[in-house]
């Protein structure tokens, strides 16, 4: 009988510590932030232009090196 009580106590301690250790769910995104992102399409264009201005010269240099190598 004492063994069963000990097993039950250990189970309770493990279960309670598992409940408290569980991460809290992430908060839902604010609808205003999503609406702002959809309302301003130029923000996306700026990101695309930034990628093009930084990545395009690197791509051109890579193509030039490959042509020179053979």
From Swiss-Prot:
Q: Where in the cell is it found?
A: Secreted; Target cell membrane
Enumerate the InterPro entries for this protein: Melittin/Api_allergen
- A Gene Ontology BP annotation from the UniProt entry: monoatomic ion transport
PTM sites of type N-formylglycine = 44
- An example Gene Ontology molecular-function term: porin activity
Q: Where is this site: Important for the flexibility at the center of the helix, flexibility that is important for the stability of the voltage-gated pore?
A: 57
Which protein are we looking at?
A: Melittin-N
**Biological source species:** Apis cerana (Indian honeybee)
Q: Which gene encodes it?
A: MELT
